[in-house]
Amino acid sequence: MCAGWGLLLLLALPLHARPQVLIVLADHLTLADVTRPDLPGLARMRREGEIALMSPGLAQKPDPVANVYATLGAGDTVRVGDISQGRMADVLRRAGVRMALLGDVGPGQPTSLLLPTPDVMSDTGEVTNPPRLWAATQAAFRSCDLVVVRLGPAQALDEYISVALSEHHGPLFVVVPTPPSLRNGTWNRLTPFLGAGDGHHAHLTSDTTQTLDLIASRDIAPTILKALNVPAPLQMTGAPARPAAPLYPADLSRMDRLTRLNQEAQNPIFWAVGLGAATIVFGSLGLYLAGHMAGLPGKAARYGLRAVSAWPLALLLAPLADPHRVSVYIALFAGLTALLALLPSPPLICALTALVIIGDGLTGTMLISNSALSEYALAGIRFYGIGNEYMGVLIGGALLACALGIPTPRPFLDPASALTPLSRLRPLVGTERGQGRSGGWGLAFWFALAVFVLSFPSFGAKAGGAVTAMATFVIAWRRLRKEPVNWMHLAGSIAAGFVLVFVWALLSHALHLRRTHLETAVGALGQGRFGYIAGVSLRKIGLAARVALHPGTLLGLMAFGLLWLAARRFLWKAIVAHLSRHPRFDAVWGAGLWGCLVAVLFNDSGIVAAILMLQCLALSLLHGLFLEEKDAPARA
């Protein structure tokens, strides 16, 4: 009898056990649009709800908008036609969730990529008539758990949100899939994302970005599924948005502004750096071969080499001035580069850059994430930690720091010299056999600190960075101590790097630190998420191929190839003699070349790290060579 009454009560439960979720889409808006003071509905949502910026990714042709919608619906970074397209809708359908699609959703609209086959679809076309659209929304909720509405201008969005906040009692999300497009069809902005319904006011982040105020477009599908109490499929690479901290609007506006400035400044800065570096390096080489290193031409050539060494550090420091215009941003970068080039040598500049990177890594990589060289937020290649760009600069600078020193008090030193020759310096970091333990411990600590910042989970673990740094520094340690180095030592140091990666993964799991890439991969394998592993692997392979074939990469490789040919033809004896006079520089130079090889082999897009590491080493070699030979006679 009791069992019968229990069954009747169970059957009497309401059909809508899960919350009713409302998603509002509005394209081509920015943070400034949804924070206008004349939009009270959106202002209320910001005050009472959650907010973040969303990375739509770079505009990918032929249809950038469609690709973003496909990503929103897949929970993974995909393009139109990918097998993952519409995965969220498939999951919802299997879970018994009924879906409705309203508003500007007619034929040819990208909303079909988000919800390919909704249970209810109403192309009202009334994107500027919020009251009528809200009536259609209420009607859809009588039979559906999820309603997606696509609206038009910001004013219409605000009117609709004002009504929804008052009358809708479930989760509500405002998603801006794409920012305003530029004339060439690309974009340079992040988009706003707002949430309401949880009753608290906070910043948002996600496990994808692990960055306050930032989520990725592939996080939208997992966020919607979580709101509907539906488990995300194992193949989704995105993660649900989650609250992180109290709201500080200045953080959002600064991230939005720097993202735009970095996108606008990248082309002029990188073309200027590339063309300027080629002109300076090959021009100074011509002056050297012509015997014009004495006097003003030689000083200008050496200053130019130091300027080329300084630009990565200048890009780290320029955003600290909080520029608001791209012209001011570029001027700050140029001024900082010119000032840093006043330092006496490329090794010192590179060592200082490495020190700044280590300090930034220990404090959250704010400088790196805002640098135009990395510019994580919009591209979405990497959202946190140290990427290949500054990994190469860090390893190169850490090596060159071992060739620096303080002048030994000898009477024959020329006090007017701008740089004491390296052979007359007492090393600041490092040791050779018989020099005592203090220098050796200093060298070990310096190398360990660089490896720690590159690999520790809480700083944004980079498995390839740990392997590259470990291999490079072990080789450097042995060479600095005048111990032999062969392929067995290289293989052993690479193995030690992988051991370190596994140790960090175990420690991260035990202490609940930021998840490492290895931990994520092992977890995916344990859950049978082979599609996730395959998808990430294919995406990294594709990214590596695109980076390797990028015109900038090819031009950089061509420049280094030409420089190698010129050095082999005209400078080889002078280089050998220079390295023999400076054994510490010779030791780190050789270790750096090994490190470039390891970077290419064990990092996705490792060619970038290798190029920047090689830049540090080559400029330091040329500067030292030209400085020593400034009074040499002209060469035939």
Regions found by a protein language model. Name each.
Residues 450, 487-636:
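Long, compositionally biased intrinsically disordered regions
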Residues 280-293, 338-343, 400-409, 476-478, ...:
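Alpha-helical transmembrane segments
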Residues 253-267, 368-392, 526-550:
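Juxtamembrane membrane-water interface segments that cap and precede transmembrane helices
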